[in-house]
Amino acid sequence: MKESVQRKLESLTERFEEVQALVSQPEIIADQDKYRALTKEYSQLEGVVKCFADYQGAQGDFESAQEMMQESDPEMREMAQEEYKSSKQAIEQYEDELQILLLPKDPNDESNCFIEIRAGAGGDEAAIFAGDLFRMYSRYAEARRWKVEVVTMNEGDHGGYKEVIANIIGDGAYGVLKFESGGHRVQRVPETESQGRIHTSACTVVVMPEVPESEAIEVNKADLKIDTFRASGAGGQHVNKTDSAIRITHVPSGIVVECQDERSQHKNRAKAMAVLQSRLNKLEEEKRQAEETSTRRNLVASGDRSERIRTYNFPQGRVTDHRINLTLYRLDDVVAGDLDAVLEPIRQEHQADLLASLSDEG
């Protein structure tokens, strides 16, 4: 292990012990903001500090085994040989784990997120596909015990959605789903297709971290145009009799957000403002990324429709992720919400890219 890495791990261990002592102090417990910040720091440090302690234990075993191998007793030497092998293997394993644990973290990874799905080329079929994608993400969220709250939905004429925006609430939701931003393409035979021809349709998905109020971008009220309108209900049921739906336009950026999910205008306005904050935050992030000179590829796409990230081919039961050339013949499972089969290889590739960029810098 490099000396610089060893020093960093020792310093993190010291800080962990310091935080551990602080969180048990009555004056810290009484100050909720400080206590929350310290418990968050504690949980962020815990994994890497435990892994470093295991690494040090294996290092100690390795050194003991080396000493024992000098013994005159053949039985002791044989035992030492076994210990030498297993501790060397453990050291290598912990070094790999520590490398990943020390990778720079995206500060938004632990956040809730907003997911926007929009039907693109393909008319009714694209809207039906947007409905399939929304169900896929909802089932995935449900399996992880995350909560899904619809912000707004614009239903398609023959099922699905022209657009749907949902808030996904749960630890690490953004960190897991951020790789879903981009163009999603479907190839299948529509139910209305009598000739059995395969049609291609597309949707765009944008995943944005929810911005905590404390970090919200200051928005000048004069820059906002707010319209109210009557919410539309499916098939005339539960149609809102008041103008409770909200449309907020941020004039300088041209961003428009609608929310008509709640019956209360006040709640719809709060939800729309939260989405607006996330979109403004995303704009800022994209500007920052554009200014960076790094040539490292970015597996977290912006959600631009031209960035096709994945194809779902129903006749072949195939899912292809174009960013990492991954092909799986498990389409039904993936669409049913078993997204980890796709997300895990992407996450690993992302980690490998980060490791490679750190090696280049080093």
Curated annotation (Swiss-Prot):
Which SUPFAM superfamilies does this chain map to?
Answer: Release factor
Q: PROSITE patterns in the record, alphabetically? A: RF_PROK_I (PS00745)
Species? Pseudoalteromonas atlantica (strain T6c / ATCC BAA-1087)
What is this protein called in UniProt? Peptide chain release factor 1
- Give residue numbers for the modification (N5-methylglutamine): 237
Compositional bias, Basic and acidic residues, is annotated for 284-295
This entry carries the following GO cellular component terms, namely: cytoplasm
Q: What molecular function terms (GO) are annotated for this protein? A: translation release factor activity, codon specific
* Record PTM: Methylated by PrmC. Methylation increases the termination efficiency of RF1.
Q: What is its main location?
A: cytoplasm
Checking SMART domains in the record gives:
PCRF (SM00937)
| Family per similarity comment | Belongs to the prokaryotic/mitochondrial release factor family.
Q: Which stretches of sequence are listed as region Disordered?
A: 284-304
Q: Which HAMAP family match?
A: Rel_fac_1
- Could you tell me where this protein is found in the cell? Cytoplasm
- Keyword tags: Cytoplasm, Methylation, Protein biosynthesis
